Each structure stands twice: as C-alpha cells, then as structure tokens.
C-alpha cells in the first residue's frame, strides 16, 4: 500500500459550511500576500512563494487554482501552466525553463504542472531515458533545497482522485460543449496507464518529499473539500515560514 492508498477520498463538507470556510481562508491569504509584498504592516518584503500543483488529469487543479487566487490582485500573483518543452528549451538542461518564472522576494507564483513532469509523464511515456529520469530525483531535491535555502516558501500539492471519479469527470467534460476542450486524446490514453502512473507518483513522493519541501496530498473527490484544503495548506505553509515576520527584506 502506498501513500495514495491511505487517503480517505470520501471526505466532504456541506456546501454552506465549505463556502464560509473558503471565504475566510481566501481573506487570510489576501492578508498574507499583502504582507509579503510589503503593502500591509511593514514595507519590508517577504520571501518568495512558489506553489506547485500536480495531480491526475481532471483532478481539479484548475478549479483549485482559481479559488486560490480569487481574492488576490492579479498584479500580485503569476499563474503559469507547463506542458511539453519547446525545441529551444530542449537545447538546455531540463530545469532551465523554470528558472525565468520563479518568483523573487515579495513575489508569488502558482505553477499548474512543473518540473515533476520529468519523473511522471516523461518517465511513463518514455520521453526521458531511464538514467535521465532516475537522476532527476537527485536534481529535483538539490534544486528545491537551493530554492528553500534562499528563502523560497515552496508548497507542493498533489490532488488525488479515485479512478471512478476521474471517469465521471471525463464523461461530464465530454457531454459539456464548454468543457469538452479539456478532454484530450492524451487524457484518455493516460487513463489506460493509470497503474503505471500511480507507481511513478508513489516513487515521486518517496524520492522528493523532504523535510524542507514536503508533498501535501489533497483528497480531491469532493471539489469543495479539495479547494478548501488547498487554500488552508498554502496559508499554513506561509504562516509557518514567516512566523512573526523575521524573514523579511527591508525596503
């Protein structure tokens, strides 16, 4: 049994209660974000915040990100989605393309997919040679260790949904003309390899969940519950990192 099997995907909250708690957490995140930007309390800016979303296809990453940034000024957060590397990006070290979009002090970035594609899709689909993706675990740990050592608050989220829930969401997307664009042939193909992907995910969690950059597993069968848990988790990570505000740079 792996870490994913230990999650209780039946958890949920009544709609009214979940909505109330989500609004509260969104307001808390807004206050924290303004504080980190030096716009509330002190003009000293706080450390960078980098929030990484990974998860199954149709696990609700996009919806969770929308709720996460809903109360934030668009000037204060950068959302970036990553797909396959371009021809130019492939001419560089595979981590190179992530460097330009990492947040600086006082900044916040949200990544929909990330460098973890190296040990997930590139591993399973054999886009990367075995020695390359196996070496990537060490490269990722060192990369993240460097970011954290420089002050980055790194929050890594895996949104987990059951096989049955994923199928239900695929069917719903197929039947909705405003959502059908989200369902691709690649999604359907990946679903047939779910067991292989699950093995890759478990290896990823084991190899890259560290004390300084742990993975946070989000139970995702209930979208309301998952969205709340995401914002709560981000708030807790920021609060734990900045404490009483000692980690700040003067204006």
Question: Where does each model-flagged region fall?
Answer:
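Short beta-strand-centered segment that lines the nucleotide-binding/catalytic pocket of NTP-utilizing
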Residues: 75-86
């Amino acid at each position: 049994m792996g870490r994913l099997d230990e999650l209780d995907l039946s958890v949920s909250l009544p709609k009214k209660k979940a909505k109330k708690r989500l609004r509260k957490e969104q307001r808390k995140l807004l206050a924290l974000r303004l504080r980190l930007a030096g716009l509330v309390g002190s003009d000293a800016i706080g450390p960078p915040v980098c929030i990484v979303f990974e998860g199954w296809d149709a696990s609700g990453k996009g919806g969770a990100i929308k709720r996460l940034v809903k109360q934030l000024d668009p000037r204060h957060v950068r959302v970036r989605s990553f797909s396959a590397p371009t021809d130019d990006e492939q001419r560089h070290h595979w981590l190179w393309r992530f460097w330009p979009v990492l947040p600086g002090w006082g900044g916040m970035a949200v990544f929909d997919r990330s460098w973890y594609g190296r040990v997930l899709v590139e591993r399973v689909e054999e886009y990367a040679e075995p020695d390359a993706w196996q070496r990537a675990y060490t490269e990722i740990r060192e990369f993240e260790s460097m970011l954290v050592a420089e002050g980055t608050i790194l929050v890594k989220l895996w949104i987990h949904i059951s096989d049955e829930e994923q199928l239900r969401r695929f069917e719903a997307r197929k039947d909705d003309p405003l959502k059908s664009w989200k369902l691709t042939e690649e999604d359907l193909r990946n679903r047939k390899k779910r067991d292989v992907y699950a093995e890759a995910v478990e290896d990823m969690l084991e190899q890259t969940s560290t004390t300084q950059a742990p993975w946070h597993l989000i139970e995702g069968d209930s979208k309301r519950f998952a969205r709340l848990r995401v914002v709560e988790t981000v708030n807790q990570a920021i609060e734990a990192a900045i404490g009483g505000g000692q980690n700040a740079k003067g204006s």
